[in-house]
Amino acid sequence: MRLNVEIMKIQYASDIHLELSDNSRFIKSEPFEVTGDVLVFAGDTGYLRDRTLPNLRFWKWASANYREVLLVPGNHEFYGNGDVLAYGDSWSREILPNVHYYQNKVVRIDNVDFILSTLWSHIRPEDEYFVHRGMNDFRQILYNGRRFTPADFNAEHEKCLDFIKQSVAESTAERIVVVTHHL
């Protein structure tokens, strides 16, 4: 006896940087080959502060070609003086009815829990000086109205990691997919 079980196909992408005109033009001329039911973007798709981001034709195309489009914010979503805390610790933002950004949220599709979080990296104390000087994040991103610091980065890492661990422990889904931007 064979069971007729439908398997959800997940298509994954990251760092497409639609805020860059070359990338945006490329996506228009060479759309993704649709190979999944759900499209997951694990960060760095565009600047959240950019008012044109929700109006890109790409989202209409993605909405029409995928059952759901799940986006996790990466660090670049907050470039241009975006504030990491502007939306709170856990939030979602709709672009279209089936296209959403999620930060520290669980989305259940069928019997699969998608655990979605930026999961900022942990910066070791001995690396703080060089990371702070070398990464644009600390010049481009705000944190509660002031410049983002390595201590803020680590605080966000802990919040995200705690959220992921708790969500995995509490899930009752048959399957779990954890989506993060950082490791």
Named regions from a protein language model:
Residues 9, 68, 98-100, 113:
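Conserved beta-strand segments of alpha/beta enzyme cores
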Residues 115-177, 182:
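Active-site-proximal loop/helix segment associated with metal-binding centers of metalloenzymes
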Residues 31-35, 100-108:
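Short acidic low-complexity segments
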Residues 1-71, 78-86, 143-147:
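N-terminal active-site segment of His-dependent metallophosphoesterases
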Residues 3-11, 106-116:
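Beta-strand-turn-beta hairpins that frame and shape the catalytic cleft
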Residues 17-19, 46, 75-77, 106, ...:
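Catalytic metal-binding/acid-base residues of hydrolase active sites
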Residues 83-102:
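Glycine/small-residue-rich loop that forms an oxyanion/phosphate-binding "nest" at active or ligand-binding sites
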Residues 10, 37-38, 112-113, 175-177:
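Structural motif
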